[in-house]
């Protein structure tokens, strides 16, 4: 989808901006290049990996994005070897993923809240998002998305 092209352009620009503090790989199975996808669905997760995961890093950051088929679904993984998410913030993000309200005290960005809501509207209840993070080791988001029931474009 156009989403992966935008992400590749975004990563190219950010890599230049941060003077090669990180590298990236995108592994997209060709048959899933046309999978219907919400606009800017992955960007907030990729941006957070760069801004927070690689903050202060001069070399050695690695961001991997993979999309492949899994039955009637597409599985998208965003994985970094950054600093990881502090436990309290991770718990708050887990609650957002479950659709629960969380306090703004932790300043969880609107980007993740917005994307999670749009994914569930567009793909339905069978869409799954999971998060794994360990401080000092990195963060991984996984999306398991069915072919959308809705035919109109996701906003």
Pin down the residues of each PLM region.
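Short C-terminal beta-strand
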Residues: 139-147
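Two-component histidine phosphotransfer core
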Residues: 1-132, 140
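Gram-positive cell-envelope targeting signals
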Residues: 151-154
């Amino acid at each position: 989808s156009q989403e992966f092209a935008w992400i590749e352009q975004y990563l190219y620009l950010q890599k230049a901006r941060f003077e090669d503090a990180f590298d990236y790989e995108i592994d997209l199975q060709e048959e899933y290049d046309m999978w219907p996808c919400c606009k800017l669905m992955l960007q907030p997760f990729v941006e957070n990996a760069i801004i927070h995961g690689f903050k202060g890093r001069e070399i050695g950051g690695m961001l991997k994005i993979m999309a492949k088929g899994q039955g009637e679904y597409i599985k998208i993984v965003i994985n970094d070897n950054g600093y990881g998410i502090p436990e309290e913030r991770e718990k708050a993000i887990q609650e957002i993923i479950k659709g629960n309200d969380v306090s703004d005290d932790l300043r969880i960005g609107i980007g993740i809240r917005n994307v999670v809501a749009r994914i569930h509207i567009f793909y339905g209840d069978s869409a799954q998002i999971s998060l794994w993070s360990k401080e000092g080791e990195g963060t991984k988001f996984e999306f398991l998305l069915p072919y959308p029931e809705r035919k109109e474009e996701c906003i």
